[in-house]
A protein has these predicted regions:
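A short acidic-to-branched-hydrophobic micro-motif
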Residues: 55-81
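Charge-rich, low-complexity N-terminal segments
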Residues: 1-65, 102
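Short, internal acidic amphipathic alpha-helical interface segments
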Residues: 71-122
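A generic structural signal for beta-strand entry/edge sites
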Residues: 45-47, 65-69, 114-118
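Mixed-charge, glycine-accented linear interaction segment located at domain edges/termini
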Residues: 134-151
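Charged/polar, solvent-exposed surface patches and flexible loops
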Residues: 18, 22-26, 88-92, 137, ...
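A short acidic/glycine-rich loop-to-helix N-cap element
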Residues: 125-137
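Short, flexible helical or helix-coil boundary motifs
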Residues: 27, 31, 90, 94-97, ...
């Protein structure tokens, strides 16, 4: 059975939006984010505003799509190729497990539209907590360690 087929047939955890919201609130409480608010929330979707690394960004969560998507994190796409390669490296078995995104649990991708770079993580096997935390860790690594290389 393919991973897509098994993903669809697995029942969703209850209060998935609440779980993701609590994780993000935890990052705000611990000072990772300078600001955090829930803009809109239903049982199936949520939209958050996060102030982080001198930026205000939106994070969109869709339970049915099993995705979390950061709105514009980076603009000035001159380094899009390098950023795409870096995002792929985040899945590499060469990285230590605590710094790696396990492709059997989540898949991070970056997209370029209208001069801006967006990041989306797709949840696999309903591991929403893992995917949420890995998205935040990856974005943090990109913003702190890598961004100056691409400016």
């Amino acid at each position: 059975m393919s991973s897509t087929r098994s993903r669809v047939s697995e029942p969703l955890p209850t209060d998935t939006v609440g779980l993701v919201t609590r994780i993000l609130e935890g990052y705000a409480t611990n000072g990772v984010f300078r600001g955090f608010s829930v803009i809109a929330q239903t049982k199936a979707t949520a939209k958050y505003r996060i102030v982080w690394h001198e930026r205000t960004c939106e994070l969109l969560f869709s339970v049915s799509r099993r995705t979390l998507r950061f709105g514009t994190i980076l603009s000035d796409s001159s380094g899009i190729k390098e950023i795409s390669n870096f995002v792929e490296l985040l899945h590499s078995s060469e990285r230590p497990p605590h710094r790696r995104i396990d492709p059997a649990r989540a898949r991070l991708r970056c997209f370029y539209r209208g001069g801006n770079i967006f990041f989306t993580i797709t949840v696999i096997r309903n591991d929403f907590e893992y995917a949420t935390r890995k998205l935040i860790h990856a974005a943090n690594e990109i913003l702190i360690d890598a961004e100056p290389k691409w400016k």
